[in-house]
């Protein structure tokens, strides 16, 4: 399931506006996918570390990286409240149909969970921490 070197499973996510989109719709050399829960302390710490990263801000501004955050759980009130504090330069979404969980499309046994994808949505890193993603981005010559 979504192993390193394989193409990531496409799925539909929903934005706060109600608009639906697919992972495959994201056009970017790299996509950081973060599965998280607002009531997870590690998730919140990770979000703060990402927000503080000057490299990430620069890569997003230069359209080298897209960040997709996905809330895979069911408490929509919690998500709607939390997502208002998410960076507007990130794609902040939830799994309205609960497809990720019901069909076990991604390993979400622990949150936060990161996947780093290339432009073709091939998995470069799977189920790693933010530090691993940052290290990869810092050490990729084409960045």
Residue ranges, per PLM feature:
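N-terminal "domain-start" segment that seeds a small globular fold
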Residues: 1-24, 136-139
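A structural signal for short secondary-structure junctions
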Residues: 5, 26-27, 60-62, 84-86, ...
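Short loop/turn microsegments at loop-to-beta-strand junctions
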Residues: 8-9, 30-31, 111-112
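Hydrophobic beta-strand positions
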Residues: 12-13, 35, 116
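Short active-site neighborhood of thiol/selenol oxidoreductases, capturing the structured segment around
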Residues: 21-50, 66-68
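Structural microenvironment flanking redox-active thiols in thiol-disulfide oxidoreductases
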Residues: 44-84, 98-104
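Short, internal strand/loop/helix patches
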Residues: 80-115, 119
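Thiol-/selenol-based redox modules, centered on thioredoxin-like
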Residues: 118-143
């Amino acid at each position: 399931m979504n192993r390193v070197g394989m193409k990531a499973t496409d799925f539909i996510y929903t934005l706060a506006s109600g608009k639906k989109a697919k992972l495959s719709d994201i056009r970017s050399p790299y996509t950081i996918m973060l599965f998280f829960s607002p009531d997870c302390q590690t998730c919140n710490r990770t979000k703060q570390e990402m927000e503080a990263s000057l490299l990430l801000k620069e890569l997003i501004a230069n359209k080298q990286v897209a960040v997709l955050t996905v809330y895979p759980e069911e408490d929509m009130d919690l998500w709607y409240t939390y997502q208002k504090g998410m960076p507007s330069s990130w794609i902040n979404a939830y799994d309205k149909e609960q497809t990720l969980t019901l069909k076990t499309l991604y390993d979400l046994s622990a949150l936060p969970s990161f996947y780093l994808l290339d432009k073709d949505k091939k998995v470069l890193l799977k189920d790693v921490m933010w530090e691993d993603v940052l290290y990869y981005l810092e050490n990729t010559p084409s960045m």
